[in-house]
């Protein structure tokens, strides 16, 4: 068995491979390309644990580790940094530190959801982004109406059926360019409504 640690970045990973007694076998920079990672993992002992920090691109890296019959260990990055206590950080020191924590049995890991669940999690995350965008657009329309003292509509929901009818009437009272921009914001909100309903 070998201990493998990945200090992953956006475009590359620095890999460190060590023996159970801590002897460094090799360190290698791997460009973020599936084939390059497969080739690297193909030279590693099957069943070896691979520590990977929870950076934004860990999904595909974990998939490749599993496909290579190695054991992914998803690291809680902040806790690991505290435990390593390094002041002068470098990629090599990070990877070596992760391996040291693995060998000591103190590597702070988090649960790795199965691939199907990771995929499903994108649905609520995307819905949340769309809802946030819609809220920003609604707030902008509220601010536009307030700028021109047209915000005194007698409705509880400006973007409900009755509120939108009143809002379209108020658009005629806005200056032409502002009305044009607000109409486009309203169209975006309607488009986002349909998209959010699809989730």
What are these regions (language model features)?
Residues 1-199:
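A detector of single, family-specific signature residues
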């Amino acid at each position: 068995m070998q201990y493998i640690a990945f200090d992953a970045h956006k475009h590359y990973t620095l890999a460190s491979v060590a023996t159970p007694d801590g002897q460094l076998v090799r360190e290698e920079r791997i460009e973020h390309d599936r084939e390059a990672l497969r080739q690297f993992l193909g030279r590693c002992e099957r069943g070896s644990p691979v520590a990977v920090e929870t950076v934004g691109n860990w999904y595909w890296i974990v998939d490749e580790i599993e496909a290579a019959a190695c054991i992914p260990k998803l690291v809680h990055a902040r806790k690991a940094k505290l435990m390593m206590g390094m002041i002068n950080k470098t990629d090599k020191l990070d990877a070596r530190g992760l391996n040291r924590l693995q060998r000591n049995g103190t590597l702070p890991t988090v649960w790795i959801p199965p691939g199907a669940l990771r995929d499903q999690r994108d649905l609520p995350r995307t819905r949340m982004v769309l809802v946030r965008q819609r809220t920003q657009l609604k707030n902008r329309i509220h601010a536009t109406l307030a700028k021109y003292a047209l915000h005194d509509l007698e409705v509880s929901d400006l973007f409900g059926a009755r509120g939108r009818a009143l809002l379209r009437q108020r658009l005629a009272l806005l200056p032409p360019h502002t009305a044009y921009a607000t109409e486009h914001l309203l169209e975006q909100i309607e488009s986002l409504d349909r998209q959010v309903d699809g989730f």
